[in-house]
């Protein structure tokens, strides 16, 4: 049998939407589209166990955030949702204190055309974007990328209403959203989409004279090159970012360390450590940091140096630097802890410390599975392969643990 051609015409599905019966909605949608819980979860940013729990009524859908993800991810026609969706000023996670009731009312009025776009409205949007950047550290990109895409669309719709300095500020906000969306696409190993968003971010940054964002976009393209094992391209993009006009010292430091990582990938240890040292000197003297570089600090630089050590097979210093970096990461940085924890396991495995490699792997395996796919998850698979090739029994233990979560 072929899937139902227009599922939203089906009376059962329309009834479920009208009643906000989320378990029935998910079950009926899957039945009509012949979809698995995993496929549905990927569309709405939920793991398969979460979909199962909702469908079996073991978990209630109570947050605005999850409702929005279901509506947006499944393409629920807004006429079925009605005013409940229109009342939302911007799609948002439920984050206390991010948008006050006054700001929410203001954003609703701006969206409906009853109030002119003003500085206070843009301040509220800035706060929302900043909060979601931090939330992504904890819940991962898969969970919120559709949500942030919806936010971007709302902000883009305001461009035609902005005048004078506000117009430039809207373009800057669009550049920040595009950079964040590019980062999340890259985090999900979707390079073509990431490059498209990076290009849009760079164009908007140039249009609005936003040197920090223009440099950041080039730095993130360097990061993408690094993730594809293109060391030479990583170096060149990092150096281009570092020379961008009107970029702050903090942004230059990020660019210089990217060049250093590219040199490490190419096996050029002297150039790698020289640029990494220079990046730390620059950031130490920096007085202003753009809001999207909130994670900057000694812990982050130690972790980056550990990454360079890994490329150069300096296992002892890699272990030391990664341990230092991880010790300074807040618990909310789940994605970063999963990634750098898996790199620490790699360093231990490279040094022949199989037991330590297994312990490091198991300490982050849950976060790697839940929010660290594909990068941290694939790194743990590489660690298992290294251990198995060395005939260490810990390799089979790790492999079995990974299979259990696959």
Each language-model region and where it sits:
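Recognition helix of helix-turn-helix/homeodomain-like DNA-binding domains
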Residues: 45-62
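A short glycine/small-residue-enriched secondary-structure motif
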Residues: 42-47, 172-176
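Conserved binding/catalytic microenvironments
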Residues: 115-122, 126-406
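A short, Lys/Arg-rich alpha-helix, primarily the initiator
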Residues: 1-33, 68
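Conserved hydrophobic/aromatic packing and binding residues within compact polymer-binding modules
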Residues: 26, 37-41, 51-54, 81
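Compositionally biased, long intrinsically disordered regions
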Residues: 20, 72-127
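The alpha-helix within a helix-turn-helix
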Residues: 30, 41, 71
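DNA major-groove recognition helix of helix-turn-helix/homeodomain DNA-binding modules
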Residues: 1-2, 45, 64-80
